[in-house]
Each structure stands twice: as C-alpha cells, then as structure tokens.
C-alpha cells in the first residue's frame, strides 16, 4: 500500500513545525520526510507548512497544521 507522503522543509522545522513532524511521524500510515529546502520560501516564512502528496498545506499553529494535513488527506484520497 502506498502511504501519503508528508514533506517538511528543515528551515520551517526550525521555525516551529518540528512538533508537527514529530506528531505525524508517529502515524504508521504516513511517510514523513525532511528536506533541506522545498523551494517554498515565501510560504515557509509565513508559518508552519508541509507538502502533502506534493500540495502545500498550511496552519497558523502546529496543531492547526496537523489537523489540516489530516483534513487534506480526507478530502483528497490517493485512490
């Protein structure tokens, strides 16, 4: 089974999304990756974000980001 891919920018982790990465890593149904730069510097500067299957998902807080990641996956199933 292919798992949803959640990607984080290391620069954004330093800005606060580290806690979201740690929460999402605990979910065995997700592949969570960390990269040096994802090329979304403007979005990265604004606040917590991640790429979910290649699409930008943002949150005003870490909790909101985690919730938005799950909401996005519910609204956009892979199959």
Curated annotation (Swiss-Prot):
It holds the Pfam family DUF1450. Transmembrane segments: none annotated. HAMAP family: UPF0349. Belongs to the UPF0349 family. This is UPF0349 protein BcerKBAB4_4757. It comes from Bacillus mycoides (strain KBAB4) (Bacillus weihenstephanensis).
């Amino acid at each position: 089974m292919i798992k949803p891919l959640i990607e984080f920018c290391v620069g954004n982790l330093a800005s606060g999304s580290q806690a979201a990465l740690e929460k999402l890593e605990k979910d065995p149904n997700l592949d969570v990756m960390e990269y040096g730069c994802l090329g979304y510097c403007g979005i990265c500067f604004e606040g917590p974000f991640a790429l979910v299957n290649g699409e930008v998902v943002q949150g005003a807080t870490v909790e909101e980001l985690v919730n938005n990641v799950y909401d996005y996956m519910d609204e956009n199933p892979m199959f």
